[in-house]
From Swiss-Prot:
HAMAP family in UniProt: RsxD_RnfD
Membrane topology: Multi-pass membrane protein
Gene that produces this protein: rnfD
Modified residues (FMN phosphoryl threonine): T185
GO CC aspect terms: plasma membrane
Cellular location(s): Cell inner membrane
Organism: Shewanella loihica (strain ATCC BAA-1088 / PV-4)
Subunit structure: The complex is composed of six subunits: RnfA, RnfB, RnfC, RnfD, RnfE and RnfG.
PANTHER family: ELECTRON TRANSPORT COMPLEX PROTEIN RNFD, ION-TRANSLOCATING OXIDOREDUCTASE COMPLEX SUBUNIT D
A single BP term in Gene Ontology: electron transport chain
Name this protein carries in UniProt: Ion-translocating oxidoreductase complex subunit D
Amino acid sequence: MAFKLASSPHLSTKAQTRGLMFKVMLCALPGALAQCYFFGWGTLIQIALAIAIAVATEAAVLKLRARPVGKTIRDNSAALTGLLIGVAIPALAPWWIAAIGVIFAILVVKQLYGGLGNNIFNPAMAAYVMLLISFPMQMTTWVAPSGAALHDLGLMQSLSVIFQGADAEQVLAYRAGIDGVTMATPLDAVKTGLSTGLTLDEILTKASFSDGFGIGWALINLAYLAGGLVMLKLKLIRWQISTAILASLFVCASIGYLLSPDTHMGPLLHLFSGATMLAAFFIATDPVTAATSTRGRLIFGSLIGLLVYLIRSFCGYPDAFAFAVLLANLCAPFIDYYVKPRAYGHRASR
């Protein structure tokens, strides 16, 4: 009888990739639904489009590589990548933004390295950075959240903006003759305001910060936090990376705020703005691209938190998680090499 030897690591576990990925997607659902509530149909369209293109791209590449298509597609890893890209891009971004990003993530970042388990960078974050650098206008034009906007684009209007290239302002002008469709994210608004000489208190008095965090963003982060806590409860992820990210970011932001409260955001604004909770629980915890040991995960997460604070405070990209995660991915092998668990039976040399 012939036995087929699978590639390492040879781990015994009852958990299957398909089930794990599906549970992660379910845990991300509260945050995704919160985004749909605040940013409208566009977010749902982007998610559906990104997942469909991700699965189709994965199937096409597997076919070209003469690899089994059905089994790999059913592991839900491509669908999860599509979901993460779908919630990361602006709700009314053109359809080709999602298409280019997803194809890049699956084809270049994942499959060219050998597929799931072999990629060295997080596919969704690598795609996000590529899109942000290549198409800054489309990637930084966010629809105003519900409560700050003077509009309520329906499903057909959102489809028109995304697929036919109609301008959201033109759609509203046609419907009601009003403006106010797009606006900066809270982090972008703070960065722009500080660059013009405003103090943080002056920036936070604007209508878009009526709840102190930016309309909608705090609740979106709370929804992702709730999903992340469920993942911890189900033991889908380890606690070290997420905890280290949030603790590191909180400490760095607290120090900066204490030293200069007029020019540095407070720790709570850092924690509940942008993609903080999404990245801390659903992106940085990717077991393929993160450090593996217990101490290594703590260092890995702390590095991400530090990088996020530095990039948000002193660089040109306010929501810095994509860059921070990719830089930490580069450091993960180095961290694993120097932070090794002691081998069983090891004796210190005399």
